[in-house]
Every structure is written in structure tokens, then in C-alpha cells.
Amino acid sequence: MSGNHTPSASGPFSALTPSIWPQEILAKYSQKEESSEQPELCYDEFGFRVDKEGSEPGCSQMTGSPLVEDPPQRLRWQAHLEFTHNHDVGDLTWDKIAVSLPRSEKLRSLVLAGIPHGMRPQLWMRLSGALQKKKNSELSYREIIKNSSNDETIAAKQIEKDLLRTMPSNACFANVNSIGVPRLRRVLRALAWLYPEIGYCQGTGMVAACLLLFLEEEDAFWMMCAIIEDLLPASYFSTTLLGVQTDQRVLRHLIVQYLPRLDKLLQEHDIELSLITLHWFLTAFASVVHIRLLLRIWDLFFYEGSLVLFQTTLGMLRLKEEELIQSENSASIFNTLSDIPAQMDDAELLLGEAMRLAGSLTDVAVETQRRKHLAYLIADQGQTLGTGTTTNLSQVVRRRTQRRKSGITSLLFGEDDLEALKAKNIKQTELVADLREAILRVARHFQCTDPKNCSVELTPDYSMESHQRDHENYVACLRSHRRRAKALLDFERHDDDELGFRKNDIITIISQKDEHCWVGELNGLRGWFPAKFVEVLDERSKEYSIAGDDSVTEGVTDLVRGTLCPALKALFEHGLKKPSLLGGACHPWLFIEEAAGREVERDFDSVYSRLVLCKTYRLDEDGKVLTPEELLYRAVQSVNVTHDAAHAQMDVKLRSLICVGLNEQVLHLWLEVLCSSLPTVEKWYQPWSFLRSPGWVQIKCELRVLCCFAFSLSQDWELPARREEEKQPLKEGVQDMLVKHHLFSWDIDG
């Protein structure tokens, strides 16, 4: 009868989980056996179509006897489970086995030797941590399916297009009526719903399809969750492919270390290995090696994580190293590299070579290289890539699924997402990426506009010593005794003792004895000029650059206010608690105001006296006497005074404050001040936010790069022009100065 057919031992479909057996095909097999006819299509024990030519790499190129469990191997596993749990396991009642297995060298040796195929579904769930996730999840798989069934997004449409492309040579996924297709659809849509920042990636489709061959649908889903959250670094499957791109650079570093001859060959022929191996990593070898070999690799992968991907790849390359070295040209090398996975037909040989060559490779070594090469990736490309804040870059965060808390805290600031407390948000990586890109764009603008900036080092200094030097450099910044000014308009020279100049010329000030007429020098000439025709430059610790002057170079305004400021605002908005009941205002500016005030109120009298002193005697122009905290407080107050009068929004205030910080070269120190105000940060931000994580230190290092450039940005650039200023021409009163010049003698030599 249809629906009750069972595969023959070691026959077609015998290695699959029973619920995915294709009953229609099994029924045809049964009829053919009774009539002694050969079936039209032949399938192996994994459901892959078999033909005379061997079909695809993932189908049946691996020769040997049918997949049969080794009884002694199964007994060793049973003995280990019984010993570990200190009770009689008997015929493996899995409900008595813990949801996770204690790690040990004995367990690792068993995994390396291979897991009995009949035990794989249960052991994979325990080794990977998927069973633990399944038990602890707030939402059941049924609820997730319900929530994702109507999710008509771009991801859902792309999933529909790829369903029949994922594994067309397998009977379970060959056509729209195949038994595995609706299962794959539900799993992929559930993943896209649960991880909205990832959505759908073709790599997940191939991995999920392979899992569905051996596990029930719900278990396959939780296995995918374990792969995404724990076994692979974040962004492996995101649109940026950040994690897998980083791992390709780590792989090249490991080849230098473990396979120096191959490294030399790749360099000589200028071969980009990642064009081949990125797909291997993205699918965890699901689409490139024979399914039998894949099972052995996955046994280790689910136990040890992404480390196995590097070890396996190095093992493959080592086995083919001699053949590669003997290749005649680049095309031959590239083709040989591409064909390596399909030529691997001995699991024991491959895994043995992988462990001999790279068995000493550790997670710590890989994570260290990941951090370093991720930074290189950012510096080289300057695109949407960013350095993670933890050793494994960051973890993917799920869609918020927690129930609301009760109490006044939830009423005022909404509920805390416990999943976000446990898993660091991949969004942090993307925020850093956007900021890094904005900083690089500003830096490239300076280097293109003003060549003297070309020698500036754009790679951030993440060392601990750099933070100690920050305040030393701030306190001991060079105070140039040379004062210079920028011409605001043209001044034509009529007499020998006058100094003529054109708009935006930089003039060295010789004397300011008279408040109206100053003496200056330009291009070797000295003379007097109207003081109101120039603007004194702030060059206490920097040298003026036209690239950073928004009155000369309009492009810097777009880069700072249009690119850098939004990137910084996004960082400050990440994890900002939002009032959900009262509808009150929630903006980073409010946090900055409170934090700046809190940092100076501890010594308010002293700070106030110093601010008055600076305002009265212009000490802040002649030399920095304010601490970063005091300077921040003063800048916030200054922005409020000028912008409130113009009824400016808080977004405008934030952008103007950032411009002040760039002018003063203290933007990175201000971030440290704000993040060090712990009571204020805890009041305004969620525990999983960027400002409450150690990641803010990395942002400080990124912002420090901007200190190498001299900005002269107008704080009030976005404010409407004042009518009083419009009514007073700049040249008004110059005639009086000319009269004064002819009535008195001027000492041009100062």
C-alpha cells in the first residue's frame, strides 16, 4: 500500500530519516522488484540520482560498499554514553541522555572516528547545542512557522525561486511535489523570520536541505539555529558575508603557515583562492563533497565548530599540493583547485591528513587572526565591513520574542530583550562598518584636497597604550606662538604699508595692538589690514587645512554632516531605551546633555570659575585649559544657546556638536566621557547596547583617526542667517580705518 513502503537494507533511500522517504518512488521500486524489471531511475541510499556517468560531486562519485554501520563502533558509543551518565543505557533510550554531552578527549576521539549513522540525528543535536536551544526557546517551532507563514518579504520570494535549485539531483527535492520541498520552504522561511538581519542566503538552503535528509524538520531547524548562532561567526549568511570573507583571509594566513610551498605558488600565479573556497565555507562543504564525506566532516563540525572548516580545507590542499605544484599554468592550477572536493573519496585519509597537518590549530589562534584580518578588510576596502567587539566578531540576534515585563520600568522604557542580553547583536558590527566607511571617506577627502595629509596613518591604533597617550597628548598639545588668520574677502593694496590679499588667503599676524587694524605678513610682504576682514584661525594643536574649512571647501560639509554624523547618530541610537507609554522624547542629544552635566557637576564651582575665566580672558583660544569634560559641557551649552534661538531640532544640535568636537580634536575623548558616565548610560541604554558594551572602546579608536586632520567647521552652519548680519556689510567702517591709518604712524615691523 502507498505510504507504507520501506527501503531495503542498504538500498535506495535507506540512509534517510523515515519521514522523508519518497513513498511514490519506493512504490515503483517495489513493483519493479516483483516484476523483476529495472527501474527507470536509480537512486543511492541518500536519495541522489545515480547514472552511468556519476552525476554530481554530491551524489555518487565516492565508491565503495553501501553505507553500513560498524557494530563495534556503535558499541563504543553506547559504552561511552553509559559510562558518562553512570547508568544502563540499554537500547539507547534517548530521553535518559542529557541534552548536551560533557566534552572530553574520549568523546573527541569517538567523533573523529565517526558517529554511527543511526545515532547521528540524536548526537548531532546534542553535540551542536541544538537540543538545548530547542528546550529553552520561548517560542516553539510551530509558533515560529505560524509567524513566518504570512511573511511575504523579498526573502520569502527568493526562497520560493531557489527551492527547486537547491538539490535537484535528490529525489526528495527534485520537483514541486517532492516530499522535502515544503519542509525546506518552512525551515528557510522560519530562519528568515527569526533572523531578520540575515534574511535568506543560498548557503543556508543547501545546509538545511542536507540536514532534512537525516533529521526531522523541527530538529533540522534548531540545528540551523545552532550553526548560525554558535558554530559559525556572525554574518556568514548576511548580505555583507562579513564572516565568511574574513575567514577567507584567515585561511590564506594559515596556508602561509602550514603550506608555504602552496602559498608561494598561489602568489606567483596571482590566484585568488577565495573565489573557490568561499563557497566551501559558506555551505560547510554541503554542496561540494560527496554526502558520505560530508557526514564525517559534519560529525566533527557539530562538535568543534568552524575550526573544522579550516582543518578540512588545509587537509584537502595538502593532499593535492604536489599535483598543484606540478601544474603548468594558472588555468590548470585554478581548475585543479576547483576539482579538489569532488576528488576526495577517502574520509579516513582526508581527516587523518587534516589532523596531522592542522590538528594543533586552536580556536584562540583562529579568533585572533579573525580580529586582525577583519581590521585589514576594513582598511583595504573601506566598505560596509566592521571590526567585531568580541573574539568571535559578534553573535546573531533573534527577532524579539520575549513577553513584556510588568512594572514601572517596562511602562517607561519598554521591556528588556533577554535574548539580546545573551547574544551580542550583529548590528554592532554593521554600525562600526558604517562609521569606519564614513571616517575613511573624510580622510580620503583630506588627502585628495590637501596633499600634506597623505602621510596620515588611517589604520586605528587599538593598543592599550594608545588610550594612555590620549590624555597626555591633549594636555601637552603644541601651542603654536605663530597666530594666523584667514581672509574673509579681497583687500586691495593701495599703499606700500598696506597688506593686500585675496579671499581665503592665510595671513601670519604680526601685531594686534590695535583692535581695528592689524599688521600681518603674506608671501614675504608686511603691511597693515582691517582686522574685521580676517578670521583668526584656531591652530593650537593643528595646522590649518583648506580641506577641513567648510567656508572654502563645501564638500567637507556633506561628508561630515551628511555621512559621518548619521553614522555616529546610529551608534548612539543603538539600544537607546524608548518610552513606550508616555510618548516622551527619546534622542541621543538628551542623553549627551545629561551625561555632560553629570560629569562636571561634581566640581561645578571650579568648572564654572574656569569657564568664566576663559570667556573673560579668551584662555581657550590662547591655550587649552579646559578638560575634555568641561569642553564638552561648554560645547553643549553653546549649541543649545545658539540653536534654541533658531528653534533647531535635536538632530541639528547633534551634528553641530560633532562639528565642534572635530574642530577641537576631542571627539574620541568626548565618547570616552559619555560612556564613562555609567549611571547615565545605564539609565538611557539597554544592557545589550553599544554604549554599555566594551565595543565603545573600539569606536573611540576609530574616531581618534580624525584627530590627525584640521577641521574649521561652522557650529551654526545649518542655522538660518541672522538678519542683523545681513544688514551689516563686512566693508562697513573700513573708511574710518583708512583715515585712522593716515593720521597715525604705524610700526610695520611690530
Curated annotation (Swiss-Prot):
<feature type="domain" description="SH3">
    <location>
        <begin position="480"/>
        <end position="539"/>
    </location>
</feature>
<keyword id="KW-0597">Phosphoprotein</keyword>
<comment type="subunit">
    <text>Interacts with GJA1. Interaction with GJA1 induces its degradation. Interacts via its RUN domain with the C-terminal region of NF2. Interacts with RAB3A, RAB4A, RAB5A, RAB8A, RAB11A, RAP1A, RAP1B, RAP2A, RAP2B and PDCD6I. No interaction with RAB27A.</text>
</comment>
<dbReference type="InterPro" id="IPR037213">
    <property type="entry name" value="Run_dom_sf"/>
</dbReference>
<dbReference type="Pfam" id="PF02759">
    <property type="entry name" value="RUN"/>
</dbReference>
<dbReference type="GO" id="GO:0005921">
    <property type="term" value="C:gap junction"/>
</dbReference>
<feature type="domain" description="RUN">
    <location>
        <begin position="555"/>
        <end position="718"/>
    </location>
</feature>
<dbReference type="GO" id="GO:0031267">
    <property type="term" value="F:small GTPase binding"/>
</dbReference>
<dbReference type="GO" id="GO:0051726">
    <property type="term" value="P:regulation of cell cycle"/>
</dbReference>
<dbReference type="InterPro" id="IPR001452">
    <property type="entry name" value="SH3_domain"/>
</dbReference>
<keyword id="KW-0131">Cell cycle</keyword>
<dbReference type="Pfam" id="PF00566">
    <property type="entry name" value="RabGAP-TBC"/>
</dbReference>
<keyword id="KW-0728">SH3 domain</keyword>
<dbReference type="InterPro" id="IPR004012">
    <property type="entry name" value="Run_dom"/>
</dbReference>
<keyword id="KW-0963">Cytoplasm</keyword>
<dbReference type="GO" id="GO:0048227">
    <property type="term" value="P:plasma membrane to endosome transport"/>
</dbReference>
<keyword id="KW-0338">Growth arrest</keyword>
<feature type="modified residue" description="Phosphoserine">
    <location>
        <position position="406"/>
    </location>
</feature>
<comment type="function">
    <text>May play a cooperative role in NF2-mediated growth suppression of cells.</text>
</comment>
<dbReference type="InterPro" id="IPR035833">
    <property type="entry name" value="SGSM3_SH3"/>
</dbReference>
<feature type="domain" description="Rab-GAP TBC">
    <location>
        <begin position="114"/>
        <end position="305"/>
    </location>
</feature>
<dbReference type="GO" id="GO:0045732">
    <property type="term" value="P:positive regulation of protein catabolic process"/>
</dbReference>
<dbReference type="InterPro" id="IPR050302">
    <property type="entry name" value="Rab_GAP_TBC_domain"/>
</dbReference>
<dbReference type="GO" id="GO:0005829">
    <property type="term" value="C:cytosol"/>
</dbReference>
<comment type="similarity">
    <text>Belongs to the small G protein signaling modulator family.</text>
</comment>
<dbReference type="GO" id="GO:0032483">
    <property type="term" value="P:regulation of Rab protein signal transduction"/>
</dbReference>
<keyword id="KW-0175">Coiled coil</keyword>
<feature type="coiled-coil region">
    <location>
        <begin position="415"/>
        <end position="439"/>
    </location>
</feature>
<dbReference type="InterPro" id="IPR000195">
    <property type="entry name" value="Rab-GAP-TBC_dom"/>
</dbReference>
<dbReference type="GO" id="GO:0032486">
    <property type="term" value="P:Rap protein signal transduction"/>
</dbReference>
<dbReference type="InterPro" id="IPR036028">
    <property type="entry name" value="SH3-like_dom_sf"/>
</dbReference>
<protein>
    <recommendedName>
        <fullName>Small G protein signaling modulator 3</fullName>
    </recommendedName>
</protein>
<dbReference type="GO" id="GO:0030695">
    <property type="term" value="F:GTPase regulator activity"/>
</dbReference>
<dbReference type="GO" id="GO:0005096">
    <property type="term" value="F:GTPase activator activity"/>
</dbReference>
<dbReference type="InterPro" id="IPR035969">
    <property type="entry name" value="Rab-GAP_TBC_sf"/>
</dbReference>
<dbReference type="Pfam" id="PF00018">
    <property type="entry name" value="SH3_1"/>
</dbReference>
